[in-house]
Amino acid sequence: MTTNKSNGNLVKLCIMGDGGVGKTSVTIQFISNHFVHYYDPTIEDSYRKQCLIDDQVYMLDILDTAGQDELTAMRDQWIRSCEGFILVYSVTSRSSFDQVQFFREQIIRVLDRDDVPIMMIGNKSDLDDERQVTFQEGKDLARCLGMSFMEVSAKTRLNVEEVFNETVRCVKRREESLLKKDNSKDGKGDHSKKSSIFKKLNQKVNGAKISICKMM
């Protein structure tokens, strides 16, 4: 595939969540295939990676953001610049799980729409002895809030690549849905009601059950 084609498929993603949940670890594992044990707290880092997803080349522009409350104003700017979002909590931290809804509400408020492609992920799934949030709790919250869901491990790389791939797919499904809606405006049928409906597909990735969004 040509460079021009990949440049025409730039997808901007933002990874958000409470401090210390492993946002940077997940991102660097995806970008560089290695796990970082120690790093300085992130304010804002940007990464790029070319990926082949469903036989299509995409250039992913990934914004890794800070979780600190004092950076809320900056976070609004990050949200406006992105098309898809990955919300991270740690399965070893109940408080970070409780913050997921706050971050989702901020995204919805800033973008002023509720059909935003959002993937919710529970990181540190390898630390089962320290787990405070069950897989079912994560799945139930994601379903309630209309988000896709996976558990991942930045350390072992479990589901890390799948998270980014599925988020891109959700972004593209929304684009296709909006295009169909625009094309049907002058038609006889009214399909607009279906354009922002998410359907859930249960799949298995690396032996772990995941919940994936599909826009109709």
UniProtKB/Swiss-Prot annotation:
Signal peptide region: none
Residues reported to bind GTP: 17-24, 64-68, 123-126
Residues anchoring lipid (S-geranylgeranyl cysteine): 213
Subcellular location(s) of the protein: Cell membrane
Source superkingdom: Eukaryota
SUPFAM superfamilies, alphabetized: P-loop containing nucleoside triphosphate hydrolases
Q: Which residues carry this modification: Cysteine methyl ester?
A: 213
State which residues form the propeptide.
Answer: 214-216
Q: How does it sit in the membrane?
A: Lipid-anchor
Quote the catalytic activity from the record.
Answer: GTP + H2O = GDP + phosphate + H(+)
One GO CC term, this protein:
plasma membrane
Which molecular function terms from Gene Ontology are attached?
A: G protein activity; GDP binding; GTP binding; GTPase activity
Q: What exactly does this protein do?
A: Ras proteins bind GDP/GTP and possess intrinsic GTPase activity.
Family affiliation: Belongs to the small GTPase superfamily. Ras family.
The name this protein carries in UniProt is: Ras-like protein rasY
Origin organism lineage: Eukaryota, Amoebozoa, Evosea, Eumycetozoa, Dictyostelia
This protein's encoding gene: rasY
